[in-house]
Regions:
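Solvent-exposed interaction patches of small proteins and small membrane subunits
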Residues: 1-122
């Protein structure tokens, strides 16, 4: 698969999963999210999809969007591998409250300012 098409697809996966995370967590406070087993697991699954997609992006593409917290997403990717515990809870909530909204904001900005990064062309 062409690298440009793959990158566009990965960005699309990250964006859609981010929207899903925000929809799932909408109107939930931290304790509600962490108590809701089904919602919590689906949020975790979507966050893993985002982190995996972002991790697979070529370094050149990452450099084109320096505002995205790449190291934060890598850290989250590692944290999501934990089975349970306070560190996982903190990582989930931080991703819902901070990482995901910031990612979606920057993707929207870059889609406008650098549309070629999001073009599905070979």
């Amino acid at each position: 698969m062409n690298q440009r098409i793959a990158a566009t697809a990965l960005l699309g996966v990250a964006e859609q999963a981010g929207l899903d995370v925000l929809t799932l967590a909408e109107n939930l406070d931290r304790d509600e999210l962490l108590r809701s087993r089904l919602t919590r697991e689906e949020v975790r699954r979507q966050l893993r999809a985002i982190a995996d997609a972002l991790s697979a992006l070529h370094p050149e593409l990452r450099r084109a969007m320096p505002e995205i917290d790449w190291s934060g997403w890598e850290h989250l990717r590692s944290a999501l591998a934990a089975t349970a515990g306070d560190a996982l809870d903190e990582a989930l909530w931080f991703a819902v409250e901070s990482l995901t909204p910031a990612l979606l904001l920057w993707l929207r900005i870059h889609r406008r300012s650098q549309p070629e990064l999001f073009a599905m062309r070979g």
